[in-house]
């Protein structure tokens, strides 16, 4: 190896090395490197290129540089914007950096150039080395088809081992460390051996890469680039013995250990976790398996909350938060008493039936609070798909558990209070009958093994306290109705509405509208006037809206009053000020700074019976009597709807014809049959009321119920229609202040009806003084509060003779 010493400017390179014979350009932006380039251009255009050991070092010293670099000749230098120089260099020979002579204004090194010592090889030995290197290169080019063909031709054309080593050192991609090892090699043989090792390693890497790509191509379509990248990553992790879901699986196993469940359930979940582990990590099957495992782990299999068994506390909570609802409260307290005596018993399945706004949903929340149960509300209104209850089978895309299982997940315990809201509003379609799906849920004998289609493992619902709500039982299928304990939540009386408004609604709306009790006062008479003149409902929702409207208007009135007082205060302060040119804001600031004592206390607005119209306008309802005088053929009936009771005027006219019975007013089939019964019964009384047989052949009977756009049905108008028809035929008048309800038989017996409380309230609101009800409804009458019948005479009748006796003038 021939060596000689000299000094040259030094350029420190980052993350790159220049080999002898290499033509390359690079950018220089460090000041010392730019100075070195410019100094070299002034001398012989030669510079020593040395790689930095750490690329992050900004001002390298001798210890920060590799000991071996390359002497290069600068072919071209271009100045770029931003104080950057681009240089084109050619590597000439290797050199050893002995020391740095100076570091400012640029690095200058004392170096020793060295040329690789030529080997004393025979022609055959050199040919063997060339062929071996060429064979390795051919294998490399086979694996790497991106190599430039000109480079391949240059290497293959080389006949000397020295030339071939130089060409391969330049063109084969290798790490900075490998390039430094080649530069530091003591002779050509060492360079040759290192190059062979580098080529062999590159070939192995390329082969593994090709195998990975082939595995990926067998699984996915070639055009899905993003998907291919994910699969490549997955295959690499598989080759390394790693999987992407290891952490998730470990987490699932930890959750399984802590899960409170039976051994059978745990074993099933463990199998599902193992199945998830065996599924590929990025396909749809994996997502389904993951969702299923997470659902199973989140269910409260045997986790329960401790119920409060304090009867006094439960009673206090129920009485404090709700007025009335006596039957509901008694049933809850009965359940608590039984639970205390037996320690364990079936949870009740209750259905609260009543008009809207009567507190069915809110009482359920209070019951949960009284019993210390988790509260879950499931809205069933409009649900028509069976899968909403039982869940979807996991074979379907986007499958989910049903609402019952979802409710348990939300509660996180197996003994919550679950409110099934609007159970009478469920419907069915071609996908299944939701009411039938609810049969298993609400059957205390079966729901201990409820099977959701998604979960597929029996879930115990026997400890869930189900409370359903409905406006009517008529739309609930009989088998489902039979499984529930029906508790009627009847309409509120005016007195009950008053207490609810005074003790609950008023305080709630004052707080909701940002007011204070010291700012508003609504008298008792004003509340009663709102109830009687501005609402007509079974519940209290409309009443709450009216109270809210009053509070909103008072809030605005208070703010306007305060603003007006502030304006007067500022105006007064400005008049007292000597500076008449002060702006409005300056005066306001001065008033605030000096705390002028003209501030007024917020006034209290009182709402009374006299000024209630200021806030709510004219009354919307009046207690009017249906008929002001006794008339022929007009009778006041009583009806019961899903939103409460109402009066029903039935009008009958007799006119010449052919004996037809004309029915108008959108009557249902049951009501039409009641009309037929009534006319048949009246014909049986022909002799008693001196009606000729020819009358029914020569006259038509027309029965009409006003508000013809509203459908009407039910049997309880039987005695009303019969009385109206007899009045029209005989010309006898009916008492205007008498209302009646009851079903009639062909023999004239009066059968019982439902919704007695609602009907009596409707009669009272209309100003009726006497009400005729079936004798068999006497027990229902005795259960009613005295205030409902106060001011009315309620007469129980067993036959039509008694009805006619009290109704006809």
From Swiss-Prot:
Expression induction or repression: By heat shock.
Keyword Amino-acid biosynthesis: no
Reaction(s) catalysed (UniProt annotation): Hydrolysis of proteins in presence of ATP
Superkingdom, taxonomy of origin: Bacteria
Chief site of localization: cytoplasm
UniProt domain Lon proteolytic: residue ranges: 629-809
Residues binding ATP: 354-361
GO terms for MF: ATP binding; ATP hydrolysis activity; ATP-dependent peptidase activity; sequence-specific DNA binding; serine-type endopeptidase activity
Active site location: 716, 759
UniProt protein name: Lon protease
């Amino acid at each position: 190896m021939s060596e000689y010493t000299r000094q040259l400017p030094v350029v420190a390179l980052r993350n790159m090395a220049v080999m002898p014979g290499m033509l390359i350009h690079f950018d220089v932006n460090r000041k010392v490197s730019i100075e070195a380039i410019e100094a070299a251009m002034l001398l012989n255009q030669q510079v020593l290129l040395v790689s930095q050991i750490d690329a992050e070092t900004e001002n390298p010293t001798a210890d920060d540089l590799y000991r071996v670099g390359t002497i290069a000749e600068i072919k071209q230098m271009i100045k770029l914007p931003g104080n950057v120089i681009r240089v084109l260099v050619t590597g000439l020979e290797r050199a050893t950096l002995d020391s740095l002579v100076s570091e400012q204004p640029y690095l200058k090194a004392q170096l020793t150039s060295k040329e690789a010592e030529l080997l004393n090889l025979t022609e055959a030995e050199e040919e063997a080395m060339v062929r071996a290197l060429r064979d390795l290169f051919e294998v490399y080019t086979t694996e790497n088809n991106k190599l430039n063909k000109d480079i391949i031709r240059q290497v293959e054309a080389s006949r000397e081992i020295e030339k071939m080593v130089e060409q391969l050192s330049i063109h084969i991609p290798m790490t900075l460390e490998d390039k430094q090892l080649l530069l530091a090699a003591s002779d050509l043989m060492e360079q040759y051996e290192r190059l062979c090792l580098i080529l062999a390693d590159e070939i192995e890497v390329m082969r593994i890469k090709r195998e990975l790509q082939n595995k990926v191509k067998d699984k996915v379509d070639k055009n899905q680039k993003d998907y291919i990248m994910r699969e490549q990553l997955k295959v690499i992790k598989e080759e390394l013995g790693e999987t992407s879901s290891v952490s998730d699986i470990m987490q699932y196993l930890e959750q399984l250990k802590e899960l409170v469940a039976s051994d059978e359930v745990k074993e099933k979940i463990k199998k599902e976790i193992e199945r998830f582990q065996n599924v590929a990590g990025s396909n749809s099957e994996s997502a389904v398996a993951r969702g299923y495992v997470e659902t199973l782990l989140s269910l409260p299999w045997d986790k329960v909350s401790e119920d409060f068994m304090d009867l006094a506390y439960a009673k206090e909570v129920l009485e404090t938060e709700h007025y009335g609802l006596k039957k509901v409260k008694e049933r809850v307290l009965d359940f608590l008493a039984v639970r205390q005596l037996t320690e364990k018993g079936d949870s009740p399945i209750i259905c609260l039936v009543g008009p809207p706004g009567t507190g069915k949903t809110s009482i359920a929340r209070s019951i949960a609070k009284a019993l210390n149960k988790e509260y879950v509300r499931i809205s069933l209104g409009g649900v028509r798909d069976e899968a909403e209850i039982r869940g979807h089978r996991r074979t379907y895309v986007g499958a989910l558990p049903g609402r019952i299982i979802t409710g348990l997940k939300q509660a996180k315990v197996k003994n919550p209070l679950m409110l099934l809201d609007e159970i009478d509003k469920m419907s069915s379609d071609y996908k299944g009958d939701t009411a039938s799906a609810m049969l298993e849920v609400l059957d205390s004998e079966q729901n201990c093994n409820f099977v959701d289609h998604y979960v597929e493992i029996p879930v115990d619902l026997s400890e869930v306290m189900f409370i359903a709500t409905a406006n009517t039982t008529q739309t609930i299928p009989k088998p489902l109705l039979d499984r529930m304990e029906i508790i009627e939540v009847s309409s509120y009386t005016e007195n009950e509405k008053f207490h609810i408004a005074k003790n609950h609604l008023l305080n709630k709306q004052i707080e909701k509208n940002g007011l204070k009790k010291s700012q508003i006062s609504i008298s008792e008479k004003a509340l009663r006037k709102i109830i009687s003149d501005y609402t007509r409902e079974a519940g209290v929702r409309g009443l709450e809206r009216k109270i809210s409207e009053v509070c909103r208007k008072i809030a605005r009135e208070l703010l306007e009053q305060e603003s007006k007082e502030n304006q007067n205060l500022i105006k007064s302060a400005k008049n007292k000020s000597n500076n008449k040119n002060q702006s409005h804001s300056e005066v306001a600031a001065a008033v605030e700074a000096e705390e002028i004592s003209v501030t007024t206390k917020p006034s209290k607005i009182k709402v009374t019976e006299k000024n209630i119209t200021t806030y709510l306008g004219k009354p919307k309802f009046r207690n009017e009597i249906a008929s002001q005088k006794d008339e022929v053929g007009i009778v006041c009936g009583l009806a019961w709807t899903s939103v409460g009771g109402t009066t029903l005027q039935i009008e009958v006219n007799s006119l010449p014809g052919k004996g037809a019975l004309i029915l108008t007013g959108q009557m249902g089939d049951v009501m039409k049959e009641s009309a037929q019964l009534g006319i048949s019964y009246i014909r049986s009384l022909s002799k008693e009321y001196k009606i000729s047989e020819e009358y029914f052949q020569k006259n038509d009977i027309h029965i009409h119920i006003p508000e013809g756009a509203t459908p009407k049905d039910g049997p309880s108008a039987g005695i009303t229609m019969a009385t109206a028809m007899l009045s029209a035929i005989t010309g006898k008048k009916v008492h205007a202040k008498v209302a009646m309800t009851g079903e009639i038989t062909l023999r004239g017996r009066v059968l019982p009806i439902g919704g007695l409380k609602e009907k009596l309230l409707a009669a009272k609101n209309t100003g009726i003084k006497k009400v005729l009800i079936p004798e068999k409804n006497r027990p229902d009458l005795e259960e009613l509060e005295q205030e409902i019948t106060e001011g009315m005479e309620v007469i129980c009748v067993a036959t039509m003779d008694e009805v006619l006796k009290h109704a006809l003038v």
